[in-house]
From Swiss-Prot:
Stored Gene3D superfamilies: 6.10.160.10, Ribosomal protein L20
PANTHER family from the UniProt entry: 39S RIBOSOMAL PROTEIN L20
Function noted in UniProt: Binds directly to 23S ribosomal RNA and is necessary for the in vitro assembly process of the 50S ribosomal subunit. It is not involved in the protein synthesizing functions of that subunit.
GO molecular function, one term: structural constituent of ribosome
Species in which this protein is naturally found: Parafrankia sp. (strain EAN1pec)
Gene that encodes the chain: rplT
Gene Ontology annotations for the cellular component aspect, listed alphabetically: ribonucleoprotein complex; ribosome
Disulfide bonding pattern of the chain: none
Taxonomy, superkingdom: Bacteria
Regions that span the bilayer: none
UniProt keyword terms in alphabetical order: Ribonucleoprotein, Ribosomal protein, RNA-binding, rRNA-binding
Organism phylogeny: Bacteria, Bacillati, Actinomycetota, Actinomycetes, Frankiales
Gene Ontology biological process terms in this record: ribosomal large subunit assembly; translation
Name of protein: Large ribosomal subunit protein bL20
Amino acid sequence: MARVKRAVNAQKKRREVLEAASGYRGQRSRLYRKAKEQMLHSMTYSYRDRRARKGDFRQLWITRINAAARANGLTYNRFVQGLRLAGVEVDRKILADLAVNDAAAFAALVEVARAALPAAAETSAA
């Protein structure tokens, strides 16, 4: 049976790892073993943080909506409740964008939510 020489494959694998780690600091970009270890950690962080990013953005949107709603005299909780009762189906991403870039449209939505709230309070009290 012929002997299998693996030098080409090994060199290619090492080169790919070192190229992927090229932006890292110190030994992590120059030594294969350190670079490989750092790449494993980096991939783990990337995977984890791609999922965490979704929650981070939702939190940012809620903070922006709350600030704009309070500026219009309503808390976030009451604002979202009023929108739900009024049948307005706008997601938090769009609401946050309106709050930042189009204050007049957001104020109109606050009024829609405010108008829907007292009607709900009267029906629940009866």
